[in-house]
């Protein structure tokens, strides 16, 4: 995966740490979702066996799942064909008083193929791109959402978040109208 670092402090050591952290984070999610192999970070942010016995606890320990569910919904609502693995901002801050102690999905930055084509009733965020799209534009499937979209506990979280948003639809529409 390729990520752009948006920070004023990016020494070579920091860039290497961030690259390693993101590789390990994705591996942790993959291992938990696909292989039922539960890992965690040690003090040096290396992966080690975890004491967790399920995928949900393993991933929730290191990712802000509410933010992931929110981002999933944004890409699903927009039918974004370009959801890719990095079409949104993510952050994590390991400082003592951090607002983002877990990997947090913040906001999208790239909607170059939103609302592409006719709605087909399929999932967009957690699905592989349609072969005809891939043939022309390349595969822009989102591996984070594909892995998590296969987890019932995550989809329950997404459904709950969607239900909550529907209850507050008036506030959403008012915000849109204000813009």
Language model feature labels by segment:
Residues 39, 43, 86-90, 179:
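Short, surface-exposed, charged/polar-biased interaction segments
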Residues 61-69, 80, 97-103, 137-140, ...:
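Secondary-structure capping and boundary motifs in well-ordered enzyme cores
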Residues 21-28, 32, 71, 75, ...:
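Generic, well-ordered alpha-helical scaffold segments in large soluble proteins
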Residues 1-78:
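ATP-dependent phospho-/nucleotidyl transfer catalytic cores
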Residues 35-39, 80, 88, 171-175:
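Surface-exposed patches in mature extracellular/periplasmic domains of secreted proteins
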Residues 84-140:
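Catalytic activation segment of kinase domains across protein kinase-like and atypical kinase folds
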Residues 115-179:
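Hydrophobic, secondary-structure "cap" segments at the distal end of domains
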């Amino acid at each position: 995966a390729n990520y752009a670092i948006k920070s004023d402090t990016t020494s070579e050591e920091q860039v290497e740490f961030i690259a390693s952290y993101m590789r390990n984070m994705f591996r942790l999610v993959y291992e938990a979702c696909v292989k039922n192999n539960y890992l965690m970070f040690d003090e040096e942010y290396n992966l080690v066996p975890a004491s967790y016995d399920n995928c949900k606890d393993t991933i929730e320990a290191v990712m802000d799942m509410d933010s992931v569910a929110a981002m999933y919904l944004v890409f699903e609502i927009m039918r974004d064909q370009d959801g890719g693995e990095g079409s949104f901002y993510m952050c994590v801050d390991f400082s003592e008083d951090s607002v983002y102690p877990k990997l947090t999905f913040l906001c999208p930055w790239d909607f170059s193929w939103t609302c592409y084509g006719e709605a087909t009733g399929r999932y967009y965020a957690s699905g592989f791109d349609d072969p005809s799209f891939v043939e022309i534009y390349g595969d822009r499937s989102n591996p984070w959402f594909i892995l998590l979209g296969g987890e019932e506990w995550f989809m329950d979280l997404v459904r709950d978040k969607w239900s909550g948003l529907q209850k507050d639809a008036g506030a959403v529409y008012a915000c849109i109208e204000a813009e």
